[in-house]
From Swiss-Prot:
Family per record: Belongs to the UPF0213 family.
Source taxon at top rank: Viruses
The organism of origin for this protein: Autographa californica nuclear polyhedrosis virus
Domain GIY-YIG: 9-89
Cross-referenced PROSITE patterns: GIY_YIG
Protein name: UPF0213 protein in VLF1-GP41 intergenic region
InterPro entries assigned: GIY-YIG_endonuc, GIY-YIG_endonuc_sf, UPF0213_domain
Length: 104
């Protein structure tokens, strides 16, 4: 397999909270850089008008791109806000174990 931008890094899943209480879920291979991008209005379009973004959860940087993207998809499409709030409160370092324990 050829080494690419996606395969030669480790990835994490993160959740940001906006002032209005909305949650944003994303993945990155460099959490500090990504948070700065969001803060400088260079990140996701849905966050460009957001102020005071707070990092409320991040997993360990222990996943390949495909695994992190799959977990992000599951959190965005299959999980309620209530589930995400439970995740934030639990703060599991290994997100995949939390998702497996909750049958996701």
């Amino acid at each position: 397999m050829a080494t690419t931008l996606y395969t030669n890094k480790v990835w994490c899943v993160y959740i940001l909270r906006q002032d209005n209480g909305k949650l944003y879920t994303g993945i990155t291979s460099n959490l500090n850089r990504r948070i700065k991008q969001h803060s400088n209005k260079q990140g996701a379009k849905c966050l460009r008008n957001a102020t005071n973004l707070r990092l409320v959860y991040h997993s360990a940087s222990a996943y390949d791109y495909n695994t992190a993207a799959r977990m992000e998809y599951n959190l965005k499409r299959k999980c309620s806000k209530y589930f995400k709030l439970r995740l934030i409160k639990a703060k599991p370092l290994l997100l995949h174990k939390f998702l497996l324990a909750n049958k996701l």
